[in-house]
Amino acid sequence: MDESALLDLLECPVCLERLDASAKVLPCQHTFCKRCLLGIVGSRNELRCPECRTLVGSGVEELPSNILLVRLLDGIKQRPWKPGPGGGSGTNCTNALRSQSSTVANCSSKDLQSSQGGQQPRVQAWSPPVRGIPQLPCAKALYNYEGKEPGDLKFSKGDIIILRRQVDENWYHGEVNGIHGFFPTNFVQIIKPLPQPPPQCKALYDFEVKDKEADKDCLPFAKDDVLTVIRRVDENWAEGMLADKIGIFPISYVEFNSAAKQLIEWDKPPVPGVDAGECSSAAAQSSTAPKHSDTKKNTKKRHSFTSLTMANKSSQASQNRHSMEISPPVLISSSNPTAAARISELSGLSCSAPSQVHISTTGLIVTPPPSSPVTTGPSFTFPSDVPYQATLGTLNPPLLPPPLLAATVLASTPPGAAAAAAAAGMGPRPMAGSTDQIAHLRPQTRPSVYVAIYPYTPRKEDELELRKGEMFLVFERCQDGWFKGTSMHTSKIGVFPGNYVAPVTRAVTNASQAKVPMSTAGQTSRGVTMVSPSTAGGPAQKLQGNGVAGSPSVVPTAVVSAAHIQTSPQAKVLLHMTGQMTVNQARNAVRTVAAHNQERPTAAVTPIQVQNAAGLSPASVGLPHHSLASPQPAPLMPGSATHTAAISISRASAPLACAAAAPLTSSSITSASLEAEPSGRIVTVLPGLPTSPDSASLACGNSSATKPDKDSKKEKKGLLKLLSGASTKRKPRVSPPASPTLEVELGSAELPLHGAVGPELPPGGGHGRAGSCPVDGDGPVTTAVAGAALAQDAFHRKASSLDSAVPIAPPPRQACSSLGPVLNESRPVVCERHRVVVSYPPQSEAELELKEGDIVFVHKKREDGWFKGTLQRNGKTGLFPGSFVENI
C-alpha cells in the first residue's frame, strides 16, 4: 500500500475530499472538513452532525481539530514509505500508519469503518501466497520435526500447519491433520500470520483529572479499564483511546499487551546519533526536532497533575502542583477508592496500593511496597525557605506517580514547613524514605518522649498497642492527631493516636538555666513535667523558666501537671481531696462547673519566664468573682518526698496571682501557701498549717503582707464549706473519654459559683490536668494545683451583658523557642458556620456525631486539627475532626 492509497482512507464523509489539518471534530467525535461544516451552517443556520444529527451548540471556528488526524499526517511526512515487496522498514512503517489510520477512520466516520479490515500487522517472516492453502493463519514446514517432548507437534517438510496461537517469539501452537501440538518458529515459514491483537493496555490504577479545562488533553480512566494504545508521546506518556475519547495518559499507570509493547518500543524517542530502529536513521533524525517541540507542548499541558498525599486527612486541592520523574512502571494490583482522600488534606488522584517514595536528586522514584506496611524512615517535607516549586517544576518529563495509601503511611510536617504548605494550599505528603537520601533536605528535629495515659488496642496492623504508663519515642507527628514512633519497651515501630499519650519533659535543675524544656510546639497533648524531690523545711526553691520548682537532687519522685488556673482576690479557693478516693472521684472533687452559661470571661494562665513586675498593685485588675480552677486528670508517679510546683506569671498591666503546691507524705499532708509580692518574686512557704491525713488545702493569695493565722483559718473554713456545698449539688461525672482532649462540661445553673473554664495551655509547660492516685494501700496521696487567672478591664462583663455567651479565645500558644511574654489581650473567637461533608461517628462522649449535611458552629480550632463546636441539629457541644467539615 502506497502513500496515496493510505491518504484515500482519510476523506471527508460529506464531500469525499481528502481531510487536512483544518478538519474539525464535533462533540459526537465525528470529523468533517471545515468547508463542509461552514456550508451546513450557511444553508441551515444551525449545525448538526451529518451522520448522527446531533445538534452542535458552538460555532465552527470554536470546534477543536482532530489531533490524531494532524499527527497522522505529520507522521506520513516524517516517515516516508519505501517501495518494495520485501519486508523492509518502509513496509513496517506503512503497516503502523495503516493501523493508526484505521483508528482515525473508526472515530471519524462510519463510512470508513470498512477500511479497518485491510490492516496487516507486522510479522517475523513473509512469503508469497501458496495455492491451495486454507484461509486460516498457517505456515509451511521447512524441515522435518519429530518432537522432543510430549505435546510437541510432529510434521514433515512441506506440510501446511494451521496456526492456533503464538506461545512466545520462539514457539507456536498449531494443528496438522487434526493433531495439535507445539513446534519451534524457525522450523516453519509463515504464510498467513496470526491476526495480531490490537495494541491495548489495562489500567492498574484510577487516573482522574482534577482540572478538566487545563488538562483536557488527558484521558481519565478507572482501574481495570482496557485502553487502545495509539502511540507513545514521550518517555512517560502515551496516547490512547477509551470508548470514543482520545487523550494522553501516564505509562506507569497501565500494563501493555505484547502488541502495545512493540508499539511503545517502536515509538520510543530516538537518541541522536543512534539508529532509531525499523525506520531509516535519516528519517529518525529528521523527526527529532518536531518530536521535541511536540513534547514540549504536551509537557506544558500535563504540568498540573498531583498525587494524593495523605494523610492529611483534611482535603485541600493542591494549587501549585509539580511533575517529577518516575521510574519504569510499578505494577501494584490493589486500588483504594477515594474515601481516604478526605483524610489527607489533598484530593488529587484516587488512592492505590502502598509504596515507598524515595527522594533523590534525580527525581521521585516509586518502589514496590515492603513486607511491612510500617516504614522506619522519617518523613520528608519541603523546608519553607527553599524555592522547591521552581526547581521541581522544571524537571522533565512530568510525573504522575502511582497513588499512595494515606491510611497506611502517616507523616507530618514541622511547624515551618506546615505553615508554608498551608499558605500554598498544599498539605503534607505522606512519604517515607531512607534517612540518607533525604537528610540533606529534611530539617533536623529531635524525637520527643511521650508516656501513654490511656490504653489503646490497635485496629490495624501498622498501629502500636499502648499500655498505660508505657514510654514512647515519637519522631513524627501528623496533623490529624496521629503519632508515629517506637515503644521504648518493645522497640516496635508504628502509629498511634496522639491523644492517648502525653509529652514528658525533665525540669531543669540548674537555676541559672532559663530555657523552657518544652516538647515540640504544635502538639496539644497533655504535658507531664518531671521534677526532682525537695527537702522539707529547706530554703525556698528558685523557679525555673518553665515555672516548675526543682532541687539539685537527681532522682525524680513525682510528676506534677500544671492546670488551667483561675482565682479571685476576694476569696482564697481551697481544693479539697481525700487520699482514699479513686482517680475518677478525686477528679470529680476538684472539677468545677460554670453557672449561668459562662457569664464571666475566661482568662488563661500561660507558663512563661519569671519576670519582675515592680510597682504593680494587685488591686489594679478586675478578676471574675468566685472563679475556680478546672483541673483535668493526669497520671502521677509515686513518690514520698516533698515536691513543689509553681507557676509564675508576669504581664505588662497586671500583677501575678499564683499557683502553688502540696507537699506529699505517706502519713500526713501539710499545706503550703504561695504568696506573691508586688515585685513579682515568688516565695515558697514550706510546711504550714497541719491538716488531717485525708485532706489537703491549697491557698492562693495576692497580698504583699503576711496575714494572721486566724484570718486565714476563718477564710479557709468558709471556703471549705462553700466547696462542700457545691460538690453535693454537682452532677456526677463519668470516666474520661478517649478523646483528643477532655473538655470541662457545664454543670447545673443553680450553683452559687460564677466563672468560666480556663482554656488549654501549651504542652510541656502548663497543662490542664490534675489528679491523684494511691501510692500504697494505707497512705493517702493528694495533689492539687491551683492558680490565678488574669483578666483585662476591657474584657470584664456584667452578669446581664448580652454578649456574655461569646467565649474568650486562649492566648496564642508559645513556640518551643519563644520565651517572651504572652499577649496582653485575649481575642474572642467568632463562631463560624461549617457544613459536614463526611459523616463522623463519635469515638467518645466528648465528641460530636456528625452526619453529612449538618451545620456546626465552630467555637475553637485546635492546632492538632480538631474543632470544638455546637451542632445546630441538636444543640450539643463537643469535639470533632476539622477535616470532616468545610467552612460556609
Swiss-Prot record:
Pathway: Protein modification; protein ubiquitination
Compositionally skewed regions (Basic and acidic residues) per UniProt: 707-718
Pfam family, one: SH3_1
Protein EC: 2.3.2.27
InterPro entries, per the entry: Endophilin_SH3RF, SH3-like_dom_sf, SH3_domain, SH3RF1/SH3RF3_SH3_4, SH3RF1_SH3_2, Znf_RING, Znf_RING/FYVE/PHD, Znf_RING_CS
Disordered: annotated segments: 275-321, 516-549, 617-637, 693-741
Residue numbers spanned by region Interaction with RAC1: 292-362
Functional note: Has E3 ubiquitin-protein ligase activity. In the absence of an external substrate, it can catalyze self-ubiquitination. Stimulates ubiquitination of potassium channel KCNJ1, enhancing it's dynamin-dependent and clathrin-independent endocytosis. Acts as a scaffold protein that coordinates with MAPK8IP1/JIP1 in organizing different components of the JNK pathway, including RAC1 or RAC2, MAP3K11/MLK3 or MAP3K7/TAK1, MAP2K7/MKK7, MAPK8/JNK1 and/or MAPK9/JNK2 into a functional multiprotein complex to ensure the effective activation of the JNK signaling pathway.
PANTHER family: CAP, ISOFORM AC (PTHR14167:SF116), SH3 DOMAIN-CONTAINING (PTHR14167)
Protein name: E3 ubiquitin-protein ligase SH3RF1
Protein source organism: Pongo abelii
